[in-house]
Amino acid sequence: MSEPAPEVPEELFREVKYYAVGDIDPQVIQLLKAGKAKEVSYNALASHIISEDGDNPEVGEAREVFDLPVVKPSWVTLSVQCGALLPVNGFSPESCQIFFGLTACLSQVSSEDRSALWALVTFHGGSCQLNLNKKCTHLIVPEPKGEKYERAVKRTSIKIVTPDWVLDCVSEKRRKDEAFYHPRLIIYEEEEEEEEEGDNEEQDSQNEGSTEKSSVASSAVASPAEQPCSPKPRAEVSKGELMFDDSSDSSPEKQERSLNWAPAEAPPLNTAQRRLPQGKGPGLINLCANVPPVPGDILPPDMRGNLMAPGQNLQNSERSEILGTWSPAVRTLRNITNNADIQQINRPSNVAHILQSLSAPTKSLEQQVARGQQGHPNASAVLFGQAKGAPETHVLQQHHPPQQPQQQHPALHLQPQIMQLQQQQQQQQQQQQQPQPYPQPPSHQFPQQVHQHQFSQQQLQFPQQPLHPQQQLHRPQQQLQPFQQQHALQQQLHQLQQQQLQHHQLAQLQQQQQQQHNLLQQQQQQQQLQRLQQQQQMQNQAAHLSQASQALQHQVLPQQPLQLSLQPPPQQQQQQQLFGHDPAVEIPEESFLLGCVFAIADYPEQMSDKQLLATWKRIIQAHGGTVDPTFTSRCTHLLCASQVSSMYTQALRERKRCVTAHWLNTVLKKKKLMPPHRALHFPVAFPPGGKPCSQHIISVTGFVDNDRDDLKLMAYLAGAKYTGYLCRSNTVLICKEPSGLKYEKAKEWRIPCVNAQWLGDILLGNFEALRQVQYSRYTAFNMPDPFVPTPHLVLGLLDAWRTPVKVTAELLMGVRLPPKLKPNEVANIQPSSKRARIEDLPPPTKKLTPELTPLVLFTGFEPVQVQQYIKKLYILGGEVAECTKKCTHLIASKVTRTVKFLTAISVVKHIVTPDWLEECFKRQTFIDEQNYILRDAEAEVLFSFSLEESLKRAHVSPLFKTKYFYITPGICPSLATMKAIVECAGGKVLAKQPSFRKLMEHKQNKSLSEIILISCENDLHLCREYFARGIDVHNAEFVLTGVLTQTLDYESYKFN
């Protein structure tokens, strides 16, 4: 930053169009301008949003609405230092990041581990430093010792954690409690090394300092592969960060997507190898640069000194040579290659190991062995503590049970890499041993070691060729002088430990390959096992339902395996066996509910409108059905919303047909009694008011008309929020086809895309589907009808439909078939409303001037009545208004909250009753309106207003004059309706969501118009930043009731 302008490469930011939010350092702006960046005045036009304040609403708008990258100013400065545009990942200023606000001091960790930890913390919003001062919030230290540790203990403001706290936080995507990661809680296992400790005390004390620097003191730090490098060399981290982001989520769906990223990481591996010194692969570099790490939780510090002391001087020259030629850029490339392993700790082992084997099959011993130690501490203790063949094999078998026989061809391409790695390690050992020939240890150890190599390789199916160079390596040493045996014993112990580490690594790689094949076979067999999985899921979830529903499930489920095994296509056969009425009996279309006796449950408690329930009864009776006030044995149908009730259990036990009001609506439309065939036709499997999807915000794409309405209702019944739009806050997108803009955006934003069957299964009791959005049955979009319920979930409900509804002869005789009409009679019978519309209106008897001509609208009347009024209006010389804004008179019989009424109240001169028009027609002239003003005492008491006073206020000044409104898109009534009401009242509706800065600017400057925010329950996720800033957001009643009463009520309708 001291010389910003000259340092900026020419046209570095030529493609950058930036929009700055908040106060940005002027030097950063100068860097951007020097690199030919362009500043835009509106965030939607920008390619990058630059801000230090991640909670600013403008930042949220850019991210949610325009999907723009938001970066901190440090992205600019580091891009200049690197001479290239850095990827935007890792530079987010948002406060939702795991380590936001954290300042960590790193102590007593190796340089590579420090780089990895530094990258993890800064990538997730924190900052790191090497000095312990007042700014520090955390001290990351592997062991409870050292000067920084002693000082941090005395400060309550500094939390002390081990490095694995960072890894676990990143793995679980949340900041975990630091108390469980204090270094004092580390437990060391010393049983395996007690004998060697006494022999090497003196040498351990000499190497203690170097041990702290070169070893990894915490097992979790060495567990994952190398993380992205320290912040400075970030120019080559783009692909690594992409993999990092993709693998940072532990959800099953994103684990599967990680497989797609893995092949893209192969080229960086080759690049890294090309840039290494000749003759040295990644494994060789790590062996020379660092002694293989020993986890702090397994071995005590003195034991680690023993393990690293032999041969240490031999490695110094090699290490300095390698470190001199191995640049940070090379390490960065290697870390990019290994990035797939970041945060794999808590994942299923098969997925994690597949990623590891695909992305970096030839990783260093340091990384691979350490990762194995994370999962198998006992095995590590045995491997490091003693050079025995049988115990090692036993431990491997214990922790890695035999896998099923798999195809061998994917493993073949890995074996040459393993052999190459072995040969490189053997060459290194030869280089170390030849300058100082030490005597051979006692002969009984070497045959034992050979046996170990052979047994392990046979067990793991690895080629035994690399064994021979090792045998040749040891034979010349057998002729050395006896006085060097003690020193050689230590050196040989070190070699054996490295060999054991090597074979442990090979075992890990082989296990990864086997697990990869297992996962692939599971995916291939998934479709064949779908029905069996569904049965098991149904049995598991039966335990979570209520007692009544549980009893039902136990009655239905025992028959499922037999039916599914005996009937391969159950859905087709069931469809053939289900009946409404007997096909042999002719039922009149108008009486298609003949023989059906309904009892109604659940709905009376849920419906506030009792008139609607009475309407149902009237409609059922009009089509030949009967409604009983209680459930009796003569009932044939139970109309219910939920499976969790005693009435439902009784009805199912008596083989009654249990259906919903939605089914009734469907058969009324089709005029035919038919079995239920959609998920909405069946009662839901949870109690009324239950909300299994309460955490979901659902959007749909590809569905129109009735199908879209059905999905809205299904989402409502499941307790989910529904949005007609798609934003990053949505949790699920329900697709008809895998195409369209919403689908593409959902894939880009990693929003699960499922079919409609997913939601139907949840309604019918398969709550496991909530965690199975990635299952193939829910991601298949070529289904003929995605609303058809899963057969095994409705077996018991369909059982009653296997016999037809009985219709007695008396019932049929009581129904008179309507006489067939002649064609000319059919033509003459037309609805009166249509007849009125096509008739020519009589010419007006009087011609009035435009100023005196009433422009009238009608609301709250039947169409036939409206046509009669229009005829009289035309005779008198009046006209029907083209739109509300031009209307002078609104004719209504009562106060109604229709669009016409709520828009007209702000602009019309008079709201009158139909009596005014009738009286005008009698007198054949328009008379004074004062005696015919609409008065509705009931509505005025209900809404606590006076219609006459409201009209007077509207005439004085429009209610929303000089006011701006931002209305969220999911508002009900629709956005178009709300906009019409607001604009008629003098307000204006903003098309774009206003930023916090704009809101405050309008609030503080009295000369600017006020901005009012209107939203609804389903859109509250769009207003999170407003709530965080204490800005009021109101519901639709602020507008609807406001225009009716012509008042502004800022308190009654705001969200808390």
Curated annotation (Swiss-Prot):
Signal peptide: none annotated. The keyword Transcription applies. Its main location: nucleus. Residues 214-223, 396-412, 419-435, 445-486 have a biased composition (Low complexity). It comes from the Eukaryota. Residues 188-276, 393-412, 419-486 are annotated as: Disordered. Residues 94-183 are annotated as: Interaction with PAGR1. GO terms for cellular component: chromosome; histone methyltransferase complex; MLL3/4 complex; nuclear matrix; nucleoplasm; nucleus. Disruption phenotype: Mice are developmentally retarded, disorganized, and embryonic lethal by 9.5 dpc. Mutant cells appear to replicate DNA but show reduced levels of mitosis and widespread cell death by 8.5 dpc. DNA damage appears to precede nuclear condensation at 7 dpc. Reduced levels of histone H3 methylated at 'Lys-4 in developing tissues. Residues 577-1056 are annotated as: Interaction with TP53BP1. Involved in DNA damage response and in transcriptional regulation through histone methyltransferase (HMT) complexes such as the MLL2/MLL3 complex. Plays a role in early development. In DNA damage response is required for cell survival after ionizing radiation. In vitro shown to be involved in the homologous recombination mechanism for the repair of double-strand breaks (DSBs). Its localization to DNA damage foci requires Rnf8 and Ube2n. This is PAX-interacting protein 1.
